[in-house]
Swiss-Prot record:
GO molecular-function terms, A-Z: hormone activity
Key word Secreted present: yes
Protein's recorded name: Pancreatic polypeptide
Family matches, as CDD domains: PAH (cd00126)
Keyword tags: Amidation, Hormone, Secreted
Residue positions, PTM Phenylalanine amide: F36
The protein's role, per its UniProt record: Hormone secreted by pancreatic cells that acts as a regulator of pancreatic and gastrointestinal functions.
One Pfam family from the record: Hormone_3
Localization of this protein: Secreted
Protein family per UniProt: Belongs to the NPY family.
Amino acid sequence: APSEPHHPGDQATQDQLAQYYSDLYQYITFVTRPRF
């Protein structure tokens, strides 16, 4: 399972934030999807 991404912090660049939110979205999708 993917690990929860860490927020890059207040000094993060837009690219770092975009990558973080992309990773976070994938993480949440993985964690919350039903297990059949």
